[in-house]
Amino acid sequence: MSSGISKTAKGKRGRPSLQQVLQQLDEEVSLLKTSMGGLPRAVEANAILHEIWIDDVHNSTAIEGNTMTRAQVEELVERGRASASLVEMLEVDGYAEVADWVYRHAADYQGVPVTVVSEAHRRAVELVWAKQPPASRDQPGAWRKTPVQVGKVVVSVPAAIPAELDAWSASTRDPKGRHPVVHAAVHHAWFERIHPFVDGNGRVGRLVLNFMLLQHGYPPAVIAKARRPRYLHGLALADDGNVNVLAEVIARAVSGTLTRFLVPALAGEARLVPLSALAARGPYSSAYLRLLVFDGKLKAVPDGNLWLSSKKWLQEYMRDRDPRGHKSLSKRRKKK
């Protein structure tokens, strides 16, 4: 089987290729492992994982049409109440429960057993289906017994689902030389083509995607609702054998989890982190920080394709500037 990356794929002008995106992601993950001890375990970093979890629950359910805001999702999972419809709250509750389990237990498995897929679906939809059962009367966690039409995609016929899921599950355990993100992308698209349930395949598919990523030492991919069109485009291209766009969407989502949540939370003020992580919790964009580095105004050190700086060095730069970005009067006077 091929690597899953199209040999003809090249980055458009001004847009990095998939290989470049994966290389940068691996450098970020390597930095996390070597400088910060790797991914925090749930018992060690509940606060960090909690923020990722909320973001994951909100965006993954929103991709499927749930209209609850992130603030409403947070209020529901933390306090058990929110101003939203009952069905939408049940959707969020179900997904939140399974995502929490995935974060804590993915590393306990090798690959994705079909029993995990079935149990993830059962937990994700049973409350919703108790209130609003599907017309087919399928049961939560059970493979569908009726044909479905999913746009122009040809999905598995019901009789073929058990055997195809067995083959899919066995394949999740063997990357076959693929990059872990590409391996996860290939199996995410494959799972959606099998479409084993009458409803809930998208949510379960993204849970399984993160299950695989976590097994390989990557943080969860939180695919933002705003990225839905490109994500669906990537799935459509993957159905035709080109997984590049889908893998890029996933890689960028993983990188976003790193730079927005993990690295800023784990890094002390003197810890060197990528400029993107420094920008995630600061007043400047990563592009502006890069300009400051090239101008010699912000201390930084190169590390492969990345530039690393620290909160401490950024604070030193900011102390040397007034709010308008000019050097302070006291500093100018000292130079006279």
Protein language model annotation of sequence segments:
Residues 1-199, 203-336:
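FIC/Doc superfamily catalytic core
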